[in-house]
Amino acid sequence: MNLNATILGQAIAFVLFVIFCMKYVWPPIMAAIEKRQQEIADGLSSAERAKKDLDLAQANATDQLKKAKAEAQVIIEQASKRKAQILDEAKAEAEQERNKIVAQAQAEIDAERKRAREELRKQVAMLAIAGAEKIIERSVDEAANSDIVDKLVAEL
């Protein structure tokens, strides 16, 4: 019986140990395990949210980059058009200035040519009068001389 009393005592001690463990040891261990499980679940959900946020940020960055490239292309095209417009305006202005200078030079040439012709006509008339004076050996008075020169200039 001794053996049976020992087994019974050990069984009672084991049951008391199990009750003690279930009442005082098991709840803190389970609380720590549940807390750790909750932290892991929170960490996983946080990581999942961070991944979604990262994907969204990358998509936004890609969209903004595309928009910036499109805007840059539009600005480049506008600058090219403006450059061509400025060049065309400068060419037109230079052409007008050239035409103006050429016309002014042509007018000056024509005026100089006309003045030279008039001067030449007067000199020819004077030479003709001088020749005529020598031929007739007399001098014509200044009024008559002036009339003759004017008539010769008009005829030439």
From Swiss-Prot:
The keyword Acyltransferase does not apply. InterPro entries: ATP_synth_B-like_membr_sf, ATP_synth_b/b'su_bac/chlpt, ATP_synth_F0_bsu_bac, ATP_synthase_B_chain. It is found in: Cell inner membrane. The chain crosses the membrane at residues 11-31. It comes from the Bacteria. One of its GO terms (cellular component) is proton-transporting ATP synthase complex. GO terms for molecular function: proton-transporting ATP synthase activity, rotational mechanism; proton-transporting ATPase activity, rotational mechanism. Keywords: ATP synthesis, Cell inner membrane, Cell membrane, CF(0), Hydrogen ion transport, Ion transport, Membrane, Transmembrane, Transmembrane helix, Transport. It is a single-pass membrane protein. The keyword Transport applies. Belongs to the ATPase B chain family. F(1)F(0) ATP synthase produces ATP from ADP in the presence of a proton or sodium gradient. F-type ATPases consist of two structural domains, F(1) containing the extramembraneous catalytic core and F(0) containing the membrane proton channel, linked together by a central stalk and a peripheral stalk. During catalysis, ATP synthesis in the catalytic domain of F(1) is coupled via a rotary mechanism of the central stalk subunits to proton translocation. PANTHER family: ATP SYNTHASE SUBUNIT B, ATP SYNTHASE SUBUNIT B', CHLOROPLASTIC. F-type ATPases have 2 components, F(1) - the catalytic core - and F(0) - the membrane proton channel. F(1) has five subunits: alpha(3), beta(3), gamma(1), delta(1), epsilon(1). F(0) has three main subunits: a(1), b(2) and c(10-14). The alpha and beta chains form an alternating ring which encloses part of the gamma chain. F(1) is attached to F(0) by a central stalk formed by the gamma and epsilon chains, while a peripheral stalk is formed by the delta and b chains. HAMAP family: ATP_synth_b_bprime. NCBIfam families: ATP_synt_b, PRK05759.1-2, PRK05759.1-4. This is ATP synthase subunit b.
